Structures are given as C-alpha cells and as structure tokens.
C-alpha cells in the first residue's frame, strides 16, 4: 500500500497461478502442475488473416518460458480465429471472448470486431490470451 512492501516470494521453483484482487489490494499465489505438452510452434488461423482458415500467422516463443507466445504488430481483419499448435487442427484453442480470455482446447472461434494492428499474447499451458490494439 505504501510502496514499501517486499518482493513476492515462492517456496520452490515451479509454476504458480497468481490471482490479484485490485479492489481489495490482495493476491493469492497457488502452485500448479507443470505443463507436460510442448509445441514446436503456435499460430493464429482464421478469417482475420484475410482468408477462410487457410493461412497460419506464426507467433514467437518466449525466450524465458516455452509456454508463452506472442506476435507484435499483427495486421488483422475483422473476423474470427483460433490459436493452434504445430500448424495442425489436432490441438487448437478458442472461446467466444474478444480481447482477452481463456481458450479451451477445441473451443469456439475467437471473434475480432475491428480491422486493426494488434499485439497478441498467448499461454499454451493455460489457454489465457490477451489481444491489444496498438494502432
């Protein structure tokens, strides 16, 4: 509250889910199982790429976590899309929430109402994504 609080600490190396309640100024940090699936690549595919689910737009894997992916300055059309692994429909994520949400494997197409330039962030372990209009 005064900016003098200590750093967050964890009892052991591993994956954790951090939940923040901004209104109450509280947080919880809960250990979660390490993901077992890893992917060579993750992409977005859909009508937002200017075609009908034909062309993949590749995301870049994070240098510090193999489950975090991003793309900066993606020019997308209004439409819908899904995230998918290894350019295959075997593993894909989606939901019906536009700018942020948690995609489920085999879920609905993600809507995008406006043609724009976006930065996109995706976590293949949780399905969480964020889409940020940048221009």
Where are these regions (language model features)?
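Short, low-complexity, Pro/Ser/Thr/Gly-rich segments in the mature regions of secreted, periplasmic
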Residues: 27-29, 127-135
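Beta-strand-rich extracellular modules
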Residues: 23, 32, 84-88
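Bacterial Sec-dependent N-terminal signal peptides
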Residues: 33-36, 135
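Structured interaction patches on ligand/partner-binding surfaces of diverse proteins
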Residues: 1-24, 90-126
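Aromatic-rich carbohydrate-binding modules that target alpha-glucans
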Residues: 1-4, 35-78, 86-108
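Active-site lining segments that contact anionic ligands and/or coordinate catalytic metals
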Residues: 78, 117, 129
């Amino acid at each position: 509250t005064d900016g003098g609080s200590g750093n967050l600490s964890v009892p052991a190396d591993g994956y954790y889910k951090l939940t923040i309640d901004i209104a109450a100024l509280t947080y919880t940090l809960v250990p979660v199982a390490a993901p077992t699936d890893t992917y060579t690549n993750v992409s977005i595919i859909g009508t937002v790429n200017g075609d009908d689910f034909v062309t993949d737009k590749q995301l870049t894997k994070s240098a510090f976590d193999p489950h975090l992916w991003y793309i900066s300055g993606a020019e997308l059309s209004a439409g819908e899309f899904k995230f998918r692994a290894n350019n295959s429909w075997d593993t894909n994520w989606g939901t019906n929430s536009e700018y942020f949400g948690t995609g489920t494997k085999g879920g609905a197409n993600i809507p995008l109402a406006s043609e724009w330039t976006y930065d996109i962030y995706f976590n293949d372990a949780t399905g969480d994504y964020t889409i940020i209009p940048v221009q």
